[in-house]
Amino acid sequence: MNPNQKIITIGSVSLTIATVCFLMQIAILATTVTLHFKQHECDSPASNQVMPCEPIIIERNITEIVYLNNTTIEKEICPEVVEYRNWSKPQCQITGFAPFSKDNSIRLSAGGDIWVTREPYVSCDPGKCYQFALGQGTTLDNKHSNGTIHDRIPHRTLLMNELGVPFHLGTKQVCVAWSSSSCHDGKAWLHVCVTGDDRNATASFIYDGRLVDSIGSWSQNILRTQESECVCINGTCTVVMTDGSASGRADTRILFIKEGKIVHISPLSGSAQHIEECSCYPRYPDVRCICRDNWKGSNRPVIDINMEDYSIDSSYVCSGLVGDTPRNDDSSSNSNCRDPNNERGNPGVKGWAFDNGDDVWMGRTINKDSRSGYETFKVIGGWSTPNSKSQVNRQVIVDNNNWSGYSGIFSVEGKSCINRCFYVELIRGRPQETRVWWTSNSIVVFCGTSGTYGTGSWPDGANINFMPI
């Protein structure tokens, strides 16, 4: 090869290398620009698909820095899109219940500023559980606590804290309410808050911290709701509300709410005669509630809510071991699945149960006449067989020498199944303990377990003689 050919060859190779390097730099620059500005295109549908017209909530936005040959590329990670809950997983199979939480509010009130409350409940968002209660507008060691046995005053508010955190002075007052229900649809909290005159109360519907809708009393006789969590499926939440006599015929309606707006109201239908203070749980694709018949029955009413067509059916828990208080002795109590048993129906107490195939898990006071003690058990055939009384897996939650109160259910979604949990209200003060002038409560919480468990009793534990009068 002569010198001229060598020069031409070397020049050609150099030009080729330079061209390749130039193209690589252009590619790197294009990649950088594309990654930086393409965040909004993540998971975009094909051009012939219709995008839903609804807001997308961004939980977090993370920037990753990747180093390529001394060139820095800032890569925007696609944000998570928050979805509505649908509760489509199966119910967890359990052997019983294990302790989960206890707030010790009354014991702490002996030496600290803790709210006077009643009607507590628990509900969870997708990541965390919260405890709620209706405050009396006062702490316990305060003269305003005198007379807090009364249910409905304009100073009552719905309190909300992380589960296990007592209602201290820094507790958030979510709304004005002497009756309430709360639930999280996967995107935000819905609070149903009832307050006002007995003959003309108002229910406010607060979603994501904003008042969205309201409804007034329809029977002018103490509009009221569940005192435990409502349930949301695919963005629609349902809550049971009653207006009318507490010991006679009343008007119960089931409301359907979408992001705080009432979208439908269904009347109660089926064989249930009286409905109060329902404890509801998701049973995909529908919702099921176990309630309190304060008129005719010590067996608990059941409401089945169809979330698609808004239809309602009702009946009674089949178990002959009935769940309300007061009630007959177990040997003489009855239930035929369809009708109230006409056994000591009035007054009653809020409670819960849930189906497990043909069986039923349930909780109730140990004392058949008053709100003392608390027990749970499963009744074989208790969901499908009239007057079934075969009891297994009994547990004592609160021994019969200590006071209990209301109880209710809440559901927690796990990786593979939906667990059922319950809380027990531990009432202290009046009317049973007349040394003091106040009425308040603490709570204890248990959740279903597939493991083994021991025994115990978890009462409130406060010495009434140590408490402010």
Curated annotation (Swiss-Prot):
<feature type="binding site">
    <location>
        <begin position="276"/>
        <end position="277"/>
    </location>
    <ligand>
        <name>substrate</name>
    </ligand>
</feature>
<feature type="disulfide bond">
    <location>
        <begin position="318"/>
        <end position="337"/>
    </location>
</feature>
<feature type="glycosylation site" description="N-linked (GlcNAc...) asparagine; by host">
    <location>
        <position position="61"/>
    </location>
</feature>
<keyword id="KW-0735">Signal-anchor</keyword>
<keyword id="KW-0472">Membrane</keyword>
<feature type="glycosylation site" description="N-linked (GlcNAc...) asparagine; by host">
    <location>
        <position position="70"/>
    </location>
</feature>
<keyword id="KW-1133">Transmembrane helix</keyword>
<protein>
    <recommendedName>
        <fullName>Neuraminidase</fullName>
        <ecNumber>3.2.1.18</ecNumber>
    </recommendedName>
</protein>
<feature type="region of interest" description="Head of neuraminidase">
    <location>
        <begin position="91"/>
        <end position="469"/>
    </location>
</feature>
<comment type="subunit">
    <text>Homotetramer.</text>
</comment>
<keyword id="KW-0946">Virion</keyword>
<keyword id="KW-1043">Host membrane</keyword>
<feature type="region of interest" description="Involved in apical transport and lipid raft association">
    <location>
        <begin position="11"/>
        <end position="33"/>
    </location>
</feature>
<keyword id="KW-0326">Glycosidase</keyword>
<keyword id="KW-0378">Hydrolase</keyword>
<dbReference type="GO" id="GO:0046872">
    <property type="term" value="F:metal ion binding"/>
</dbReference>
<dbReference type="GO" id="GO:0016020">
    <property type="term" value="C:membrane"/>
</dbReference>
<feature type="binding site">
    <location>
        <position position="297"/>
    </location>
    <ligand>
        <name>Ca(2+)</name>
    </ligand>
</feature>
<feature type="binding site">
    <location>
        <position position="118"/>
    </location>
    <ligand>
        <name>substrate</name>
    </ligand>
</feature>
<feature type="glycosylation site" description="N-linked (GlcNAc...) asparagine; by host">
    <location>
        <position position="146"/>
    </location>
</feature>
<dbReference type="InterPro" id="IPR036278">
    <property type="entry name" value="Sialidase_sf"/>
</dbReference>
<dbReference type="GO" id="GO:0005975">
    <property type="term" value="P:carbohydrate metabolic process"/>
</dbReference>
<feature type="disulfide bond">
    <location>
        <begin position="232"/>
        <end position="237"/>
    </location>
</feature>
<dbReference type="Pfam" id="PF00064">
    <property type="entry name" value="Neur"/>
</dbReference>
<feature type="active site" description="Proton donor/acceptor">
    <location>
        <position position="151"/>
    </location>
</feature>
<dbReference type="GO" id="GO:0020002">
    <property type="term" value="C:host cell plasma membrane"/>
</dbReference>
<feature type="glycosylation site" description="N-linked (GlcNAc...) asparagine; by host">
    <location>
        <position position="86"/>
    </location>
</feature>
<feature type="topological domain" description="Virion surface">
    <location>
        <begin position="30"/>
        <end position="469"/>
    </location>
</feature>
<feature type="glycosylation site" description="N-linked (GlcNAc...) asparagine; by host">
    <location>
        <position position="402"/>
    </location>
</feature>
<feature type="disulfide bond">
    <location>
        <begin position="421"/>
        <end position="447"/>
    </location>
</feature>
<feature type="transmembrane region" description="Helical">
    <location>
        <begin position="7"/>
        <end position="29"/>
    </location>
</feature>
<feature type="glycosylation site" description="N-linked (GlcNAc...) asparagine; by host">
    <location>
        <position position="200"/>
    </location>
</feature>
<feature type="disulfide bond">
    <location>
        <begin position="183"/>
        <end position="230"/>
    </location>
</feature>
<feature type="disulfide bond">
    <location>
        <begin position="124"/>
        <end position="129"/>
    </location>
</feature>
<feature type="glycosylation site" description="N-linked (GlcNAc...) asparagine; by host">
    <location>
        <position position="69"/>
    </location>
</feature>
<feature type="glycosylation site" description="N-linked (GlcNAc...) asparagine; by host">
    <location>
        <position position="234"/>
    </location>
</feature>
<comment type="similarity">
    <text>Belongs to the glycosyl hydrolase 34 family.</text>
</comment>
<feature type="binding site">
    <location>
        <position position="324"/>
    </location>
    <ligand>
        <name>Ca(2+)</name>
    </ligand>
</feature>
<feature type="binding site">
    <location>
        <position position="292"/>
    </location>
    <ligand>
        <name>substrate</name>
    </ligand>
</feature>
<dbReference type="InterPro" id="IPR033654">
    <property type="entry name" value="Sialidase_Influenza_A/B"/>
</dbReference>
<feature type="disulfide bond">
    <location>
        <begin position="280"/>
        <end position="289"/>
    </location>
</feature>
<feature type="region of interest" description="Disordered">
    <location>
        <begin position="325"/>
        <end position="349"/>
    </location>
</feature>
